[in-house]
């Protein structure tokens, strides 16, 4: 065997090994699903479903809690706002707080303002520039519906009236005049939800 042949043989073997290594593909890892967040459940208010939510299977007298997320909109033309436990104070175990595990949520509560009446014009003054601002506050009747998150089934509905008590102590204005709708009262909503959340 010539010297030329001896040097070419190792080079050829290296080439074959490189080709073999290139042929072994590393499996691509499956993308990790993002954990559910509160805003994902808004679809249920629009008659959608959440496949990743656990099925709602109530057992009377079990003492088991079926967690909820709560949404509100002032009129049917508005976007839904998800309410945190600090802004809508249902019993603590009922709602998942921000940063909690929304993968446990079984129920979605959707509140929509269906009738509003002007209750008070609240005047405010900016201490810095003495500009005057006006807040028109409306008493509102809300339609409250509760859905099973996984199936999208409507489980029940009721109406509650949010009544005016006093002008807010302060308000963050974007315009010189704005409308504001009284928040739905917690107590009647809690009474309505009791049989679904804690049967």
What feature does the model see in each segment?
Residues 2-11:
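Bacterial N-terminal signal peptides that target proteins for export
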Residues 18-21:
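C-terminal motif of bacterial Sec signal peptides marking the signal peptidase cleavage site
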Residues 23-25:
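Bacterial signal peptide processing site
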Residues 31-102, 158, 164-199:
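Compositionally biased, intrinsically disordered linkers/stalks adjacent to structured regions
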Residues 101-149:
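Surface-exposed short loop/turn segments
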Residues 141, 157-159:
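Well-ordered beta-strand positions in beta-sheet-rich domains
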């Amino acid at each position: 065997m010539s010297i030329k042949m001896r040097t070419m043989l190792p080079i050829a073997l290296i080439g074959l090994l490189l080709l073999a290594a290139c042929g072994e593909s590393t499996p691509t890892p499956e993308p990790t699903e993002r954990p559910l967040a509160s805003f994902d459940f808004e679809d249920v208010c629009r008659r959608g479903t959440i496949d990743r939510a656990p099925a709602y299977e109530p057992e009377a007298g079990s003492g088991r809690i079926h967690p909820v997320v709560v949404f509100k909109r002032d009129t049917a033309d508005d976007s839904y706002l998800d309410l945190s436990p600090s802004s809508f104070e249902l019993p603590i175990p009922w709602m998942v707080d921000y940063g909690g595990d929304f993968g446990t949520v079984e129920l979605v509560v959707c509140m929509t303002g269906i009738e509003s009446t002007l209750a008070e014009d609240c005047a405010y003054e900016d201490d810095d520039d003495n500009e005057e601002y006006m807040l028109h506050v409306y008493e509102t009747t809300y339609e409250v519906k509760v859905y099973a998150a996984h199936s999208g089934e409507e489980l029940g509905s009721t109406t509650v009236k949010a009544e005016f008590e006093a002008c807010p102590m302060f308000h963050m204005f974007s315009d010189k005049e704005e409308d504001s709708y009284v928040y739905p009262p917690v107590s009647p909503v809690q009474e309505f939800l009791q049989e679904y959340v804690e049967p």
